[in-house]
Amino acid sequence: STLDRSSAASDVYKRQYAYSAVYYPHGVSTNLDGSSIVIPSSSIALRTFAYNDQVAFPWFAPAGFQRGVVTNASSVGYVDSASGEFKAVSLNEGQRDSLYSNKINPIANFPARGVNVFGQKTLNANTSALDRVNVARLVVYIRERLDDIVKPFLFEPNDAAVRADAKAIVDRFLANLVTQRGLFDFVTVCDTSNNTAERIDRNELHIDIAIQPVKSIEFIYIPIRVQNTLGQVG
């Protein structure tokens, strides 16, 4: 039916953009011959991802003054459609907030701090931790590593001993992510509760995982209370 097709299309959209992010604006960089060129915001973001992974881990937010430093653009702005010239843009706090509320990660030039990526929202349509880049990259990392970690269990006997070994190796991997500040906690299940007789007969091994990812600080509140001279501060 039309409703079914619409629902299916919506599901595809959510899956397609759950791990996507948008950045604004573009930037000016230097070409190999020394000339100035305009580079897309995606190029700036990817360079920032690479820098983040050099100094931290993929599950740290590639944004802010610590890991969001832009090293491949001297200024940010847009190309004017009428003149074809690059127009520098200095996003103020209100403009940055407006962009961020619409899931657009601002790239801004800060006085005495230079150009920095100042947001890390994804286009995830659902309300979940996957609406942040650091969590999305964490999940991608976990999926890729687990794919390698469990491969040695292919064609092994699907019995209690192998299931215990599989759970143990996954637990060690996830425990390491807790140490490396990627996860707060996790739970894994690999026993007869999720490896039923039917699944075993289909030659399948199931390892169910639930994770609590570490989230980044994006808002800081410091309330200050002023006391009179005779008042007690407490």
Outline where the language-model segments fall.
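Structured, hydrophobic secondary-structure cores that serve as assembly/anchoring elements
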Residues: 1, 7-234
